[in-house]
């Protein structure tokens, strides 16, 4: 096993570029799973187990967020855990989305039509507002939102850190939960491009999880919304006083799926949005990759062209469908980053949208 294979970010850009459709990144990941003899370190296990860490961190969110920003704490993590001291950690929310949702579940059941929602780690532990933004849009369109019976992290960080057996167990649980939702007549939506790609493609290709029956019903929320609008099944109305200059970054896994068009076309439906598509570049963080001391400089060098273009454009916000891209861009530029769903929710004329959809 060549340890240099660990330098692969699994961004899939080699697969996008390959004219023969060779799944190069999959071959590298399969080799890492099969032949790597190195046991995951404590650092790698911590970075990979997002559900466990998120559960601990959110319960002490104010303290956690304060501590993770202290230079002495960063220095200790750098020297002991080899998590680079220059890396900025995402903040945690004291109230998770699941906790918030329990108080509103009855309201969601009152709708005649429903979708199921896989929120993932970020929209649960770090930024529940993204999940709330999705509910705002779907409710205005006449759809209630149900959570899955059970949900675990999609497992992308587990695979990247040598814990593929655990990733497979979590993947099987997620697929079984989605099957129940689909059997009830609900499509399953997500708000993370990486979660979507992992469950749709990596489960089958890397973890050998049978998901053929689930994949057609699993979609990124922007893709589902765009297709529903185009088919005339839902209508969106937007505020006349909303104006923003946005720069859209196509996350690597979004590019591999070919789904950026859905997010950008939805954003273009907002009359007050001036949208610029950023050049096709990886931001460099690749999930947990950019947190590791041995990768940090390389991570920042990979993202440098993207950061430069963003600073030159000076948008009001950067838009992207990937949460780790958001962390990297916000840390490395002067701009804040929003998921397209959050922009749509902010721009939405809720009352008019409800009227148009008879919600």
What are the functions of these language-model segments?
Residues 1-10:
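Ferredoxin-like iron-sulfur electron-transfer modules
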Residues 24-359:
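Iron-sulfur cluster-binding electron-transfer modules in prokaryotic oxidoreductases
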Residues 6, 15-19, 122, 126:
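Conserved aromatic-histidine-acidic binding/catalytic patches
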Residues 13-25, 29:
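CheY-like receiver
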């Amino acid at each position: 096993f060549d340890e240099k294979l660990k330098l692969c970010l699994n961004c899939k850009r080699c697969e996008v570029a390959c004219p023969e459709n060779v799944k190069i990144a999959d071959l590298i990941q399969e080799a890492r799973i099969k032949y790597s003899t190195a046991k995951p370190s404590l650092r790698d296990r911590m970075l990979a187990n997002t559900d466990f860490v998120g559960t601990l961190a959110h319960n002490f969110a104010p303290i956690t967020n304060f501590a993770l920003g202290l230079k002495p704490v960063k220095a200790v993590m750098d020297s002991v855990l080899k998590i680079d001291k220059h890396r900025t950690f995402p903040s945690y929310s004291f109230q998770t989305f699941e906790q918030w949702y329990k108080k509103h579940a009855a309201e969601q059941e009152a709708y005649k039509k429903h979708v199921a929602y896989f929120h993932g780690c970020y929209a649960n532990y770090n930024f529940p507002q993204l999940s709330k933004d999705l509910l705002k849009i779907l409710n205005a369109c006449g759809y209630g939102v149900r959570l899955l019976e059970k949900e675990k992290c999609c497992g992308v960080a587990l695979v990247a850190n040598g814990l593929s057996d655990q990733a497979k167990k979590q993947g099987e649980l997620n697929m079984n939960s989605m099957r129940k939702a689909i059997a009830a007549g609900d499509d399953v939506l997500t708000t993370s491009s990486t979660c979507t790609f992992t469950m749709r493609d990596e489960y089958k290709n890397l973890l050998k999880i049978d998901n053929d029956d689930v994949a057609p019903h699993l979609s990124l929320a922007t893709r589902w919304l765009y297709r529903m609008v185009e088919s005339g099944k839902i209508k969106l109305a937007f505020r006349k006083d909303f104006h923003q200059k946005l720069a859209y970054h196509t996350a690597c896994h979004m590019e591999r799926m070919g789904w950026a068009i859905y997010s950008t076309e939805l954003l273009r439906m907002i009359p007050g949005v001036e949208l610029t598509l950023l050049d096709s570049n990886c931001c460099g963080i690749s999930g947990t990759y950019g947190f590791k001391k041995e990768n940090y400089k390389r991570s920042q060098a990979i993202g440098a062209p993207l950061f430069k273009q963003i600073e030159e454009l000076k948008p009001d916000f950067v838009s992207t469908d990937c949460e780790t891209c958001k962390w990297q861009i916000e840390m490395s530029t002067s701009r804040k980053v929003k998921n397209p769903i959050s922009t749509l929710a902010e721009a939405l004329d809720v009352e008019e949208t409800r009227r148009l959809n008879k919600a």
